[in-house]
Amino acid sequence: MNTKSNPYYYGILFILLAYLSFGILDTIQKTAVQYHSVFQLLFIKYLFCLLFSFFIARKNKVKKFYISNNYKIQITRCILSTLESCFFVLSFRYLALADAHTIGSLSPVLFFVFSYIILKEKISLSTWIAIIISFVGVILIMRPGINIFNPYLIIPLLAAFFYSLYQIATRLNAEHDNNETMLFYNGLIGSIITLVFSYFFWQPLHAFSFIFFIFVGLFFCTGLYLQIKALSISPASILAPYHYSIIIWAILFGFLVYNEIPDIFTLFGAIIIVASGIFIFRYSNK
């Protein structure tokens, strides 16, 4: 691939690097969440997000980024973001990285469902079929009714549910506020919520805790910056399918770091979810 044949090359490259950074972040969080509460980790992440928002606002020369034109939607989306993050990071405590990410990758599909319900957007019959097929992939992974069913798989499913609602709220909020404002409130409200809950679910800090915290913040901000950079170069519709690359990193890092090997059901379920998701993205943007 070269920039002449594909003008979005750098955008695609940046988004792939962003998901690599998020993949490393989640690998670190999987270990960190064994020793710290979810809220402690998320407080660090949202605090870094808050500091990062000042950098982005200054870089883009946006002065009144701290003023929202619709606080109701803004606060709602931030609460949804916090709920999604809580469930997703919690899932790392009980599940393999590949399982958590594969189930979590249902969120783009759920987004289309909620777009139909909440935003009243039209969805074609072929898209509905792809949505149903993607749920078959989830059922294949979860295997309800079978003795080996793992109830902890419901945790990333809840994360996918809240993340899809967060995306809906973000789309609504984008009509009133710019990206710098949304990033600022994500960090501010997320920090406040997780700080309060950290007090009630506090776990003693260790000598290595601050190493975890630094790397969590570093890789989160790196991924966030690369994601923003990618979206500034290429349309979201072009970049959306590359979201699924994080499943590859989850499988790879899960195997290398935690000796996790996905079973055949997880692999087939992942293929079904990814294929359905890519079809929906491509078909809906024609």
Functional labels for PLM-detected ranges:
Residues 1-40, 148-172:
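Glycine-/small-residue-enriched transmembrane alpha-helix faces in small-molecule transporters
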Residues 126-142, 265-284:
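Hydrophobic transmembrane alpha-helices of multi-pass small-molecule transport proteins
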Residues 32, 41, 91, 97, ...:
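Hydrophobic/aromatic residues within transmembrane alpha-helices
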Residues 2, 49-69, 136-148, 190-209, ...:
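Membrane-interface helix-cap regions at the ends of transmembrane helices
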Residues 9-18, 57, 63-87, 151-159, ...:
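Loop-to-transmembrane-helix transition segments
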